[in-house]
């Protein structure tokens, strides 16, 4: 069996993967229409930093659950070799470079939904990694999770 669907960790991880972006997008859209988080936190930048902390924290929980779910799943002996581990390591490192450099280029408010708070960048970011990939955060995250 390739996937053990009886593992609770699998279902909890899938729920978390689904819930997290839904929650922060609902919160951000509500912020855009009502400024509830701006008012609660005393300013747009503070509200954006608050949602950034929530998103980052939820991501850490998701990653821990994902790791546990993987550990609870059966392994495929075909993939248990040095070449696969090397490729996996290179994908992870490359993916993290794309994610980290994207975050650096965009800053906290550019990365974590600042536009919903009315915080806009003065110009489009075109340097690395955006000159290599159109969506380096999505591609980098996918590479890291493979």
Place the predicted regions along the sequence by residue:
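Membrane-anchoring alpha-helices and their flanking helix-loop junctions
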Residues: 1-132, 139-146
């Amino acid at each position: 069996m390739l996937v053990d669907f009886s593992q609770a960790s699998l279902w909890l991880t899938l729920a978390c993967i689904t819930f997290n972006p839904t929650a922060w997008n609902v919160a951000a859209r509500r912020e855009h229409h009502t400024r509830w988080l701006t008012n609660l936190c005393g300013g747009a930048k503070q509200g954006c930093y608050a949602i950034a902390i929530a998103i980052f924290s939820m991501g850490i929980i998701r990653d821990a659950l994902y790791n546990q779910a993987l550990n609870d799943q059966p392994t495929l002996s075909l993939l248990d070799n040095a070449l696969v581990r090397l490729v996996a390591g290179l994908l992870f490192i490359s993916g993290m470079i794309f994610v980290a450099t994207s975050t650096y280029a965009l800053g906290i408010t550019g990365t974590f939904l600042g536009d919903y708070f009315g915080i806009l960048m003065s110009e489009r970011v075109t340097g690395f990694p955006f000159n290599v990939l159109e969506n380096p955060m999505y591609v980098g995250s996918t590479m890291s999770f493979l």
